[in-house]
Amino acid sequence: MSGRDWYTWHADYDRPDSGLSRRLAWVQDRIRAALDDAPPGPVRVLSICAGQGRDLIGVLATHPRRGDVTARLVELDPRNTEAAHRLAAAANLPGLEIVTGDAALTSQYIDLAPAGLVLACGLFGNMTDAHIERTIDYCTRLCATGGTVVWTRARWAPDLVPRICAWFEGRGFEQVWLSDPGYHQCCGAHRFTGAPAPLAADDVMFAFTGHNISHGPTRTGPPGHTRG
């Protein structure tokens, strides 16, 4: 089990000079852009390992498409989901469903997939390379045609970001935006140009290995719960 406290970890979002604060701003910009570009009508959003939901809730609080959005945010730590419930209530967002549970399970998303926006923020820093690629493969089932996946990954050496982009692009996604490589944190957005495959009900999309481990097979953290 990971010794990191994922509830107190969110405090860095409140520091304007932190890398996480910058990353949050990037993610929110991509969410706004995806909502701005979404066709008229309902918009479905899935957030994997949603934490306190600051990215999505922070945008929807003031976005003109807020009433069109039905979203499910899945997060393992109940303290974080409690915080997300408070934020959603304060923003008067009844279209958000906040689930305390294992974000790796496809059963959490099957009735809302494929979605117009998929948030995979904080996933890719604690998986093996194989599980990152596997999760991206599942994005072809989670994401609707024309939908967007917003994702994050720190640029540890060796920098895996180019391979992540290649994995997306090899599965029918086109790059919409990528953050400046001069920063340690990275945010990307890829739009799905293919047709979504069916999502199986009982699959496990990924398992976690611990912070900044790309190749080792040993799982040291709980599934569905990391922020790399």
Q: Could you describe each region identified by the protein language model?
A:
Residues 1-40:
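Class I SAM-dependent methyltransferase Rossmann-like catalytic core
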Residues 39-51:
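Conserved class I S-adenosyl-L-methionine
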Residues 52-66:
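Conserved SAM-binding loop of SAM-dependent methyltransferases across substrates and taxa
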Residues 83-111:
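S-adenosyl-L-methionine
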Residues 115-131:
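A short SAM/SAH-binding and catalytic strip from SAM-dependent methyltransferases
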Residues 132-145:
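A short glycine-rich, Lys/Arg-flanked "PGG" loop and its adjoining helix->strand segment in the class I
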Residues 143-154:
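Conserved beta-strand signature within the Rossmann-like core of class I S-adenosyl-L-methionine
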Residues 177-178, 182-228:
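SAM/dcSAM-binding transferase cores
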